[in-house]
Amino acid sequence: KLPNTKGHVLVSDQSSMFLSKPCNVSDYGLIYAGVQKNVGPAGMVIVIIREDLIGEPQEKTPTMFMYKTHAESDSMYNTPPCYSIYMCKLVLEWLKNEVGGLKAMEKRNVEKAALLYDFLDRSKLFKGCAEKESRSIMNVTFVTGDKDLDAKFVQEAAAAGFVNLKGHRSVGGMRASIYNAMPAEGVEKLVEFMKQFEADNA
């Protein structure tokens, strides 16, 4: 649920959630999203900005960092990253033609996240970090409550083929990133591994 901004402009970094579910862009003054999570290869961003907010930047702002520069040149101020744009095109076609659009994508993502959260809610070893009303369907954070056991889990998970589960430095523990491209089968396999780890270490 969006906050009541009382007339103030709402700016949102949607790098982790962009295209994971429908979004009413008119609710925002500016949306910024790195494409590397759900849209394409790293090295490109998508910006959706209200025209009246483009305005005049501060004098010291480098030309390439000005939204005005890119808006006035239709994002062609310099040579665009053609390969990244092409890959994004393929992802968008997949999302539309194979998945069935953003509502269908959201359904997939909610179901995937539920597999993991349902296990965490029942687990006697693992505990989710986020409050239920604030849970992400893209990044699931969890801990065992023991830093050494967390490290053991990350190590054994990597050996079993579950990589990049080490948690963000601000939270610690573990983080399972289950972006659009992650199939439900991948989450199911992770839950199976977590169940076995709990049985071996509880």
Residues covered by each model-derived region:
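Short beta-strand-to-loop capping motifs
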Residues: 49, 142-146, 178-180
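Conserved PLP-binding catalytic core of the aspartate aminotransferase-like
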Residues: 126-157
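Active-site C-terminal subdomain of aminotransferase-like
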Residues: 30, 35-117, 131, 200-202
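Generic non-transmembrane alpha-helical segments
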Residues: 119-123, 152-161, 193-200
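PLP-dependent enzyme catalytic core of the Aspartate aminotransferase-like
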Residues: 159, 168-202
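A short linear hydrophobic-aromatic micro-motif
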Residues: 125-129, 161-167
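Catalytic PLP-binding core of fold-type I/II PLP enzymes
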Residues: 1-26
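General beta-strand structural signal in soluble alpha/beta enzymes
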Residues: 10-14, 32-34, 164-167
